[in-house]
């Protein structure tokens, strides 16, 4: 006979055996494959589960113990290592002589007496020369102005005169794209058809028919109480003033420092070591020459410069230019020959015409009618009025009460409330057999006579209100 556990005997769904992750009653290494999924969904033998990717323990270590030798220990033997001798320095004994605090600069460079050096200035001439300098620059002596005729310009004469007749030549764009007149387009707008139905639209809705207006109560407005000033006069007293009264004490002393602290009445000594060693030399008085008073001339100004007045142009011929004159050939072709011109003669060349593709489209000469595919092939049709399948309104509904019968009340058949077998300490009709390795309590069905006795016992147990139920927590 088939045995059952608490999970299989329960009919209310509140009793089940604890699903433990490991077997607490069986000491085996087999994994526990029991779960809620495996209980509800049976295993199909036609489908095999995939193998585990966990590596297998195929490696078996040898019984010989491993030697504690490495390549470094085997090839390199130990040598005697002596400790490093540390040099012992002599103990420092401070000298009893005093330090002279002299530097190398003071030892090598002895001081010498310092005297002032007179400034190096050019000697002043007490007797200035009043003669005027008569000299002629080299440029004016060598290059004298002369009268030379003006050269004729080498540019060509401007002989072009635009024609007075209008330019009648046409362009390629004007030949290919002639001006065409306006194209009359056909309107695709449908004609205004007369309305087939003149019945006005009913604006009656279910809300307007079933809505019943109720009188609205007047809104309650809360009136604020008027402010009443207090009749007791305000004494400007607070809890602080009443509880803590001021006491007479010493006046506060000022912590402001004095404007001039005592002991600083002596003047500040602004002398330094540099000012004591290096005194200022007596400076002689600077010689200043008195300016000469300006005396305006009595003669009339001749408006001549010094060069114009004293340097006149002597008689002489203009200097001849050493630059060769330009040999200009106004007519004839240059017939100079070179090796390149002799070897590579010029040949007659014809202008190549551009390669134009053969036009594959024949452009129409008629103007474009501006018709699209839709306008050319579209055939207008009259609109078809579809028949409405909406049922006609049968008028407002009366206050007919709703039937209290529903599908649930008609088709529902009450059943007797039976007690779950798993709620008993010992389920009736079953005897406890064992607890398996996963903690499931296995029960075995008894014989017919035993089941009748157990049924009597179950009735007696149901009459006892203090009977303890079996509760197995997950």
UniProtKB/Swiss-Prot annotation:
UniProt-annotated stretches for the region Mn 5: 166-199
Region annotation Disordered: where it falls in the sequence: 446-474
Region Mn 3, residue ranges: 98-131
One of the GO BP terms on file: cellular response to cold
Region annotated Mn 7, chain positions: 233-266
UniProt keyword annotations, A-Z: Cell projection, Cilium, Cilium biogenesis/degradation, Cytoplasm, Cytoskeleton, Flagellum, Repeat
Composition bias type Polar residues, residue spans: 448-457
Principal location class: cytoplasm
Mn 9: region residues: 300-332
Region (Mn 4): 132-165
Start and end residues of each stretch annotated as Mn 8: 267-299
Tissues expressing this chain: Widely expressed, with highest levels in testis. Expressed in mature spermatozoa (at protein level).
Chain intervals for the UniProt region annotation (Mn 12): 367-400, 401-434
Pfam family, one: SAXO1-2
Region (Mn 2): 65-97
Free-text domain note: The Mn regions are involved in microtubule-binding and stabilization at low temperature. They are required and sufficient for cilium targeting.
Protein family: Belongs to the FAM154 family.
Subunit structure, interactors included: Associates with microtubules via the Mn regions.
Family matches, as PANTHER family: STABILIZER OF AXONEMAL MICROTUBULES 1, STABILIZER OF AXONEMAL MICROTUBULES 2
UniProt name for this protein: Stabilizer of axonemal microtubules 1
Gene: SAXO1
């Amino acid at each position: 006979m088939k045995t059952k556990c608490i999970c299989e005997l329960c009919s209310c769904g509140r009793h089940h055996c604890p699903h433990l992750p490991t077997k607490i009653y069986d000491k085996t290494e087999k994994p526990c494959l029991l779960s809620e999924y495996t209980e509800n969904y049976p295993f199909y033998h036609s489908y095999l589960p995939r193998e585990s990717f966990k590596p297998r323990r195929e490696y078996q270590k040898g019984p010989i113990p491993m030697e504690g030798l490495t390549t470094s220990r085997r090839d390199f033997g130990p040598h005697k290592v002596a400790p490093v001798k540390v040099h012992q320095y002599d103990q420092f004994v401070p000298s009893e002589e005093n330090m002279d605090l002299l530097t190398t600069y003071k030892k090598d460079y002895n001081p010498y007496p310092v005297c002032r050096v007179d400034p190096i200035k050019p000697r002043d001439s007490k007797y200035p020369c009043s003669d005027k300098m008569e000299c002629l620059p080299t440029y004016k002596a060598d290059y004298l102005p002369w009268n030379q005729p003006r050269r004729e310009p080498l540019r060509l004469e401007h002989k072009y005169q635009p024609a007075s007749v209008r330019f009648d030549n046409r362009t390629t764009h004007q030949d290919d794209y002639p001006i065409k007149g306006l194209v009359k387009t056909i309107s695709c707008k449908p004609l205004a058809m007369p309305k087939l139905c003149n019945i006005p639209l009913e604006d009656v809705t279910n809300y307007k028919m079933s809505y019943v207006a109720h009188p609205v109560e007047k809104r309650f407005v809360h009136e604020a109480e008027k402010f009443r000033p207090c009749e007791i006069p305000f004494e400007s007293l607070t809890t602080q003033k009443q509880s803590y009264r001021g006491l007479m004490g010493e006046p506060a002393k000022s912590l402001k420092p004095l404007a001039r602290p005592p002991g600083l009445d002596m003047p500040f000594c602004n002398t330094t070591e540099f000012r004591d060693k290096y005194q200022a030399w007596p400076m002689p008085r600077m010689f200043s020459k008195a300016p000469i008073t300006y005396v305006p001339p009595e003669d009339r100004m001749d408006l001549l410069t010094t060069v114009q007045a004293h340097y006149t142009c002597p008689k002489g011929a203009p200097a001849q230019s050493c630059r060769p004159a330009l040999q200009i050939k106004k007519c004839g072709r240059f017939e100079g020959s070179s090796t390149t011109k002799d070897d590579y003669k010029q040949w007659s060349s014809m202008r190549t015409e551009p390669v134009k593709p053969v036009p594959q489209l024949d452009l129409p000469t008629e103007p474009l009618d501006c018709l699209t595919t839709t306008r050319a092939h579209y055939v207008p049709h009259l609109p078809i009025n579809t028949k409405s399948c909406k049922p006609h309104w049968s008028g407002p509904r009366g206050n007919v009460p709703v039937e209290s019968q529903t599908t649930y009340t008609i088709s529902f058949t009450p059943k007797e409330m039976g007690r779950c077998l798993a709620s008993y300490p010992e389920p009736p009709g079953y005897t406890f057999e064992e607890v398996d390795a996963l903690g499931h309590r296995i029960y075995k069905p008894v014989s017919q006579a035993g089941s009748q006795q157990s049924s009597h016992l179950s009735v007696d147990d149901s009459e006892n209100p203090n009977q303890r139920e079996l509760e197995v927590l997950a």
